[in-house]
Design a protein with these regions (language model features):
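Alpha4 helix (beta4-alpha4-beta5 surface) of REC/receiver domains from two-component response regulators
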Residues: 30, 80, 103-118
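Non-catalytic signal-transmission and effector/linker regions of two-component phosphorelay proteins
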Residues: 1-16, 22-41, 60, 121, ...
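Acidic, metal-coordinating helix/loop segments flanking the phosphotransfer/catalytic sites
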Residues: 44-66
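Acidic catalytic/metal-coordinating carboxylates
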Residues: 47, 77-80
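Active-site residues of response regulator receiver
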Residues: 69-71
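Short amphipathic alpha-helix used as the core "switch/output" element in two-component signaling
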Residues: 53, 79-92
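His-Asp phosphorelay/catalytic-motif detector in bacterial-type signaling
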Residues: 12, 38, 62-65, 90-95
Length: 151
């Protein structure tokens, strides 16, 4: 048994990604699967309205293990998604990483005030996501739960 198996449920990790840009969504899904394994389920919402609706449908049994939310959705949608997540009985305790290209201190501060676990810069990098996953205990410090060969 690989020592990393305890970090990977047999069915993979369930990640909820809220991203309106198709290219950024593709990058995020790729990085998530590199770090957490191909068996990881990535649920993608393309806008705040869709995300808030899905958050309202999650239960304790099917909630995501991690949420990644684009802060700069149209109409300040990222903030509404954070608010909905923290107001949801099922999702209130789910680690939530904000991904953003915003350099405004106010945006970053408000993200943390609304319950973000971390704020990561766009485009999402493997190194930054890995560091935060280790920090919250979703990955062992020795490396990723899923190893890919570079040969």
């Amino acid at each position: 048994m690989d020592t990393n198996d305890k970090f990977m449920p047999e069915f993979g990790v369930r990640v909820f990604l809220v991203e309106d840009n198709a290219e950024h969504s593709f990058i995020a899904v790729t990085v998530i699967r590199q770090l957490l394994g191909e068996a990881s389920e990535v649920i993608v919402a393309e806008n705040a309205e869709e995300a808030v609706g899905l958050i309202g449908q999650f239960t304790e049994n099917d909630r995501p293990d991690l949420m990644l939310v684009d802060l700069r959705l149209p109409d300040n949608g990222g903030f509404s998604v954070l608010t909905a997540a923290r107001s949801s009985e099922a999702c209130a305790s789910v680690p939530t990483f904000v991904i953003t290209s915003s350099l405004y201190d106010q945006d970053i501060a408000q993200s943390y005030e609304l319950g973000a676990s971390a704020v990561l810069c766009k485009p999402l990098s493997r190194a930054s996501l890995r560091e935060e996953l280790i920090r919250i205990g979703k990955l062992p410090a020795s490396g990723s739960a899923h190893t890919t060969s570079t040969h």
